[in-house]
């Protein structure tokens, strides 16, 4: 059984800490800062950091990699098509990574960056997805390198995963994302209920993650481009009809960028 905890970093990043409590082994996902990880290891003597999983090259995801590798000897996994510091294993779509007794499938997720990857496993009691900055709770990453078509395809690929899949994204953006979701679907009861629940969580200084694929299908406008009401709002924003789901996505993303 793997336990997963969030190590907060910077203003809104989460470094995900995977723990094999029976064997005192652990792994981290996207350590943008080494300090929170080293602090945790310092409080847990006898634990071994054996793997570092990286989704993409942005500094707030890789800034702590080299120091952690130097301190612990952990093996570093990351996308083949991006420059990842201290990377040992370069990963492409369809690869499989074995970490803490779980086999993670590597999914290419171009959009936020061109080489972005996600890690997915169905081997745990509940399927797990580490989506980096591709799929957020109620949102998605900005398009720094890829096209709207690429990002839409990446998100649709994630939306097809089992609905019970737990989604561990890299930032606490949920509340602001839900404000946008309410603008897109103002009459959606699931969106409103989620907004109220997350508002309370954040007021209590609790994190809003993980989400699930099922919740995202209901409340994330970027996964709901096939819905007529979502298309209508996208058309209103652009001032013309968006003929494809990818163009609906592009309209939503451009709207969110200035929301």
UniProtKB/Swiss-Prot annotation:
**Cofactor(s) listed in the protein's UniProt record:** Zn(2+)
Q: Does the keyword Hydrolase apply?
A: yes
Checking Pfam families in the record gives: HAGH_C (PF16123), Lactamase_B (PF00753)
Which InterPro entries did the record assign?
Answer: Clx_II_MBL, Glyoxalase_II_hydrolase, HAGH_C, Hydroxyacylglutathione_Hdrlase, Metallo-B-lactamas, RibonucZ/Hydroxyglut_hydro
Keyword check for Metal-binding: yes
Its recorded reaction(s) are:
an S-(2-hydroxyacyl)glutathione + H2O = a 2-hydroxy carboxylate + glutathione + H(+)
Similarity annotation: Belongs to the metallo-beta-lactamase superfamily. Glyoxalase II family.
Stored PANTHER family: HYDROXYACYLGLUTATHIONE HYDROLASE, HYDROXYACYLGLUTATHIONE HYDROLASE GLOB
Q: What name does this protein carry?
A: Hydroxyacylglutathione hydrolase
Q: Which species does this protein come from?
A: Pseudomonas entomophila (strain L48)
Q: What is the lineage of its organism?
A: Bacteria, Pseudomonadati, Pseudomonadota, Gammaproteobacteria, Pseudomonadales
